[in-house]
């Protein structure tokens, strides 16, 4: 499966931390020859433009924050793009570094996660 030019990074250029991380990790994608399309996230103050998700409660314990809802809408907009265009895409966050060539052996959702908490 080839998705070399269909990688979308969700970023918030209005947020100093998000901009910092995306600027830091983009060279790692360039190193492996990937072009990353920058996708400007849904902002909490623009949530009123979106009303098609029902969030309920987070783990049944609390309401989701406006930032969490905006994150879900950002991903959902890209999933809709994927379905409407019938294209395979990769969706990454602003702080995802590419450390090796991507290998998507199956169609569908592939999750690559690495959480390091030091």
Per-region residue spans from a language model:
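An acidic/histidine-cluster motif and surrounding catalytic segment
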Residues: 1-92, 96-118
């Amino acid at each position: 499966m080839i998705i070399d030019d269909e990688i979308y990074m969700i970023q918030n250029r209005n947020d100093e931390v998000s901009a910092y991380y995306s600027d830091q990790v983009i060279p790692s994608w360039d190193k492996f020859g990937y072009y990353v399309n920058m996708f400007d996230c849904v902002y909490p103050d623009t949530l009123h433009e979106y009303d098609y998700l029902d969030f309920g409660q987070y783990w049944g314990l609390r309401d989701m924050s406006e930032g969490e809802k905006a994150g879900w809408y950002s991903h959902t907009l890209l999933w809709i793009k994927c379905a409407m265009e019938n294209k395979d895409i990769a969706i990454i966050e602003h702080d995802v570094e590419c450390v090796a060539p991507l290998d998507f052996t199956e169609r569908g959702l592939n999750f690559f996660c690495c959480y390091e908490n030091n």
